Amino acid sequence: MSSVLEMLWVEKYRPRSLDDIVDQKHVVERLKQFVKQRNMPHLLFAGPPGTGKTTAAHALAHDLFGENYRQYMLELNASDERGINVIREKVKEFARSRTPPEIPFKIVLLDEADNMTSDAQQALRRLMELYSSVTRFILIANYPSKIIDPIQSRCAFFRFQPLSKQDVIERLRYIAENEGVDYEEEALDAIYEISEGDMRKAINVLQAASYLGKVTVDAVYRVVGMAKPREVREMLATALKGDFTAARSLLRKIMIEYGMSGEDVARQIHRELFSTELKMPEELRVLAADYLGEVHYRLVEGSDDDIQLSAFLAWLTMMSRKLEV
């Protein structure tokens, strides 16, 4: 392979046109209408990471402009280039350049637009008005509420949903078989649980795990540096049985063996609290979720990982005794 990008499966298997996108059908059908009409408004793509927002923008540009679409598309990552000067200079210069044949506009793609400063967004709003005859803007955001109302009102809104388990696993299976990777079906399930509908993350995990040989559940959790769900459930079950010391030992083992932060452990605990495989009264499950929220907040604020998570296990142990679990 001639470049690093060609070695990355997430790039190798990225859809090139709208016809190649098998998910987000409600979005794709509307975008195809823009291609058919050879015209489009400003667009705002919103949704969680890895759901195909940037891919859809590139596929739309490809179908409008052809193989050389990149010369008619200015792509900026707003989280890296938030300043008002970027908006005023780069976008203004590109907007004034020549338009492609047959299509009367070019495209400015602003990825992570929700990270732009308020001043930069105000400047963008004015540029959108000034160059709307020759330029269309596609804004990509994880949190559309951070986009100022005057910009939102000028855009057609598209919400990208987290990908279904079936869509993610089918894609992973296709890639694994195409690359000649030996894998366990349970490992694909584990990758989906870890990625939470983020296709980009899922493909990257699959590729990383493939370097260890057969893609197994153990290999998957090893490459992402996460504890296996059964290990977290064992820790919680031990606390529920009233053995705080043993539960805390399991906590220490998890954090040291996997190098996990307190926030990472808290997120895994939260996931396992709602697992049907963890047996606990519904009342305690609700109370535990509420208390874990407080622990997570303190961890985010910088509190000590070991102290906060040990406190959670101590609380769980005491509550289980009180409720006679």
Curated annotation (Swiss-Prot):
Keyword Nucleotide-binding recorded: yes
Gene Ontology, cellular component aspect: DNA replication factor C complex
UniProt keyword terms in alphabetical order: ATP-binding, DNA replication, Nucleotide-binding
Cited SUPFAM superfamilies: P-loop containing nucleoside triphosphate hydrolases, post-AAA+ oligomerization domain-like
UniProt binding sites for ATP: 47-54
Biological function: Part of the RFC clamp loader complex which loads the PCNA sliding clamp onto DNA.
Pfam family of the protein (one): RCF1-5-like_lid
Highest taxon of source: Archaea
Protein name in UniProt: Replication factor C small subunit
GO molecular function: ATP binding; ATP hydrolysis activity; DNA binding; DNA clamp loader activity
Family: Belongs to the activator 1 small subunits family. RfcS subfamily.
InterPro entries per UniProt: AAA+_ATPase (IPR003593), ATPase_AAA_core (IPR003959), DNA_pol3_clamp-load_cplx_C (IPR008921), DNA_Rep/Repair_Clamp_Loader (IPR050238), P-loop_NTPase (IPR027417), Rep_factor-C_ssu_arc (IPR023748), Rep_factorC_C (IPR013748), RFC_lid (IPR047854)
Coiled coil listed as a keyword: no
Family matches, as PANTHER family: REPLICATION FACTOR C / DNA POLYMERASE III GAMMA-TAU SUBUNIT, REPLICATION FACTOR C SUBUNIT 4
Assembly notes: Heteromultimer composed of small subunits (RfcS) and large subunits (RfcL).
Gene Ontology annotations of biological process type: DNA repair; DNA-templated DNA replication
